[in-house]
């Protein structure tokens, strides 16, 4: 499960059982995120959480990291048997927006920030899976 953590809302993405294709799952209001993840994990198999690392171009942490790090700590404590992979999330929102344009979504649909968060999480998860799969080939 990929988590594009945001202060207000968080995009989530998951993969198929053989880990080939990442798919947008939903956008959750961040205050409800932890409850949503616990309920999801109770009914679906999740062995890895992929969480973005928010950095500036000079590799320094962005302001978002002050919110992301406490969440990652909470996730680690609640799910000690699950892997937490950290990935660079720079440009994922821009890539998500471009994906929406390329797919022909109307301007009104592209303004839906929740969709951008879901697509950004999907991009993070697909990149992570591509990296893992290339490592094992």
Task: Map each language-model feature to its residues.
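Phosphate- and other anionic-substrate recognition elements at nucleic-acid/protein interfaces
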Residues: 3, 7-8, 13-137
């Amino acid at each position: 499960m990929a988590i594009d953590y945001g202060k207000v809302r968080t995009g989530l993405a998951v993969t198929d059982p053989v880990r080939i294709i990442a798919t947008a799952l939903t956008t959750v209001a961040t205050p409800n995120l932890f409850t949503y993840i616990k309920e999801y994990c109770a009914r679906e198999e999740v062995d890895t959480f992929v969480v973005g690392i928010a950095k500036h171009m000079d590799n320094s942490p962005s302001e978002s990291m002050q919110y992301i790090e406490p969440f990652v700590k909470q996730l680690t404590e609640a799910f000690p048997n699950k892997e937490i992979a950290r990935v660079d999330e720079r440009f994922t929102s821009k890539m998500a927006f471009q994906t929406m344009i390329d797919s022909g979504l109307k301007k009104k649909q592209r303004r839906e920030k929740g969709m951008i968060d879901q697509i950004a999480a999907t991009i993070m998860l697909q990149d992570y899976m591509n990296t893992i799969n290339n490592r094992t080939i």
